[in-house]
Amino acid sequence: VKGGPIMSKGINSRKVAVIGTGFVGSSSAFALMESGLFTEMVLIDADKNRAEGEALDIAHGLPFARPMKITAGDYDDIVDAAIIVVTAGAGQKPGETRLDLVKKNVAIFQSIIPEIAQRKCEGILLIVANPVDILTQVAVKLSGFPENRVFGSGTTLDSARLKYLLGEHLQVDARSVHAWIIGEHGDSEIVAWSSANVSGVPISEFCEMRGYTEHDEHMEEIAQGVKNSAYKIIEKKKATYYGVAMAVRRICEAIIRDEKSVLPVSSIQHDTYGIEGVTLSMPAIVGKNGIEKQLAIKLNEKEQEALKKSAEALKEVLEDLDI
């Protein structure tokens, strides 16, 4: 990843800003309040009343958590934020794909990102709005920030969904499951089955140990279950937000604590299996400087081809955009 300087002295490492206080933004703000990672949080929304209401509602839970300052503000209030979480954008409607949202949300980003850039913010820009891969690339271009400081939540949630479903299927703690969803956060996403394991035991072997012989069939069902999760939830309750809020919290934790955790975040790829200049998710080391290193995990031929197809699908959308 093309890097920039480490977290600057002008940054308050315990301050976070959340731009957009819809379902995802407010749920993320709540998860961040509970995390104890920050002492200050500012919420920004085009609807100032909404931001003020969410800030008050979340702040009323502080006596049960840790002391911090939660306010609604404007772009001048984010200059010293260590992390700026961007969730603002139109939500996915039933039957709509994430890529269907492109033009609406690119237009929203064309008003938000320059506001951040012109204030010369030195924090990390974490993009959460969908389609996250496209919008992350748009944010890099519009901000002019170094690539290591602008990345998306990517397939962090998809990978968690995969671990959850595998844990349920195999009757094992989901935290012991090590498996990645890579590529687009969307319909062309790929399960990296060839590297999936349960505490070092390859998935296929673990299935047999658990008495599952038809594991190929089960794995395909699980892959489809992950891919269709959001559609299923949106159909039933109009939006998904709790899972992604936990993903946002996890990424922020890795940054603030400089954990150097490996997370499947969305960033511009450089010669990843021949993919160049397209933003998609691959595991990366995440710490206080944002993305420290992208990891080209071992993929079999079929997975490599699927990853290239995912990149092509995203590239076509990018070429259609006027940015």
Residue ranges of predicted features:
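Conserved N-terminal Rossmann-fold NAD(P) cofactor-binding segment
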Residues: E40, I44-A82, E96, K315-I323
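N-terminal Rossmann-fold NAD(P) dinucleotide-binding loop
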Residues: G25-S26
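Rossmann-like NAD(P)-binding element
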Residues: P63-I124
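Glycine-rich Rossmann-fold phosphate-binding loop(s) that bind the pyrophosphate
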Residues: T21-G22
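Rossmann-like NAD(P)(H) cofactor-binding subdomain of soluble oxidoreductases
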Residues: T97-K163
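Short, Lys/Arg-enriched N-terminal segments with co-localized hydrophobic residues
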Residues: V1-I6
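C-terminal substrate-binding/catalytic lobe of Rossmann-fold NAD(P)-dependent dehydrogenases
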Residues: S143-R149, D158-I323
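Conserved S-adenosyl-L-methionine
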Residues: E34-E40, G144-P146
